[in-house]
């Protein structure tokens, strides 16, 4: 019996086409060229997920400095359907959570989820996210067009403090039980 390996890798000009293809298959919307240019500049905030050396998922985030807050926005986090429920989504989310904790200066992490994507909503609720708003007609050309805004509030550290943001982390069982669904 062999062990399965889940690893995250950088998005580079050499593999950006894999990300584009993955997003085309996983998400019901298409992303413009600017999205991919920005992803190439995102560093640790954009990762491909490999399962036994095969690209099966990706996470792409950006820093949002609006409303007098510094927030981390999850633009996409998804996995090919045959590879869901294997802990890949959890590994991608934990990478982003670790980034936010190490930085220590984020007020929250947030994302938009199509209102009928119950699997994604439940996935994020396991990590302490809450529905904080619903945006009507958020999506164009897909139904339903409304999106929930999910947010996980982080404790912002004081300047010159050595403490890190607090978070809810997955226990060892949640990794094997985590289910990742597509959303935008």
UniProtKB/Swiss-Prot annotation:
> Could you tell me what reaction this enzyme catalyses?
N-terminal L-methionyl-L-alanyl-[protein] + acetyl-CoA = N-terminal N(alpha)-acetyl-L-methionyl-L-alanyl-[protein] + CoA + H(+); N-terminal L-methionyl-L-seryl-[protein] + acetyl-CoA = N-terminal N(alpha)-acetyl-L-methionyl-L-seryl-[protein] + CoA + H(+); N-terminal L-methionyl-L-valyl-[protein] + acetyl-CoA = N-terminal N(alpha)-acetyl-L-methionyl-L-valyl-[protein] + CoA + H(+); N-terminal L-methionyl-L-threonyl-[protein] + acetyl-CoA = N-terminal N(alpha)-acetyl-L-methionyl-L-threonyl-[protein] + CoA + H(+)
Location of the protein in the cell: Cytoplasm
Q: Report residue spans for region: Disordered.
A: 157-176
This entry's Enzyme Commission designation comes to: 2.3.1.258, 2.3.1.-
Give start and end of each N-acetyltransferase domain: 6-155
Loss of this gene results in the following: Flies display disrupt centromeric sister chromatid cohesion very early in division. This failure of sister chromatid cohesion does not require separase and is correlated with a failure of the cohesin component Scc1 to accumulate in centromeric regions. In contrast, no mitotic defects are observed in germ line cells during oogenesis. (Microbial infection) After infection with E.chaffeensis, results in reduced bacterial replication rate and increased survival. RNAi-mediated knockdown in the whole organism, in the fat body or hemocytes results in a similar phenotype to the genetic knockout. However, knockdown in the eye, salivary gland or wing has no effect.
Enumerate the residues binding substrate. Answer: 31, 75
Can you name this protein?
Probable N-acetyltransferase san
List, from the UniProt record, the residues annotated as the active site of this protein.
73, 112
**Composition-biased stretches (Low complexity):** 157-174
């Amino acid at each position: 019996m062999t062990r399965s390996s889940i690893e995250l890798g950088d998005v580079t000009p050499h593999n950006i086409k894999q990300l584009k293809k993955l997003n085309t298959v996983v998400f019901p919307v298409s992303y413009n060229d600017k999205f991919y240019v920005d992803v190439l500049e995102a560093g640790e905030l954009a990762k491909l997920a490999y399962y036994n050396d095969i690209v099966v998922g990706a996470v792409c985030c950006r820093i949002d400095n609006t409303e007098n807050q510094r927030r981390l926005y999850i633009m996409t986090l998804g996995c090919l359907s045959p590879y869901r429920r294997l802990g890949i989504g959890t590994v991608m989310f934990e990478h982003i959570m670790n980034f936010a904790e190490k930085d220590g200066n984020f007020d929250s992490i947030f994302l938009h989820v199509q209102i009928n994507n119950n699997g994604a909503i439940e996935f994020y609720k396991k990590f302490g996210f809450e529905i904080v708003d619903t945006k009507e007609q958020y999506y164009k050309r897909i139904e339903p067009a409304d999106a929930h805004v999910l947010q996980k509030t982080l404790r912002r550290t004081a300047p010159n403090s050595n403490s890190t943001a607090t978070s809810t982390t997955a226990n060892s069982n949640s990794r094997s039980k985590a289910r990742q669904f597509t959303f935008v």
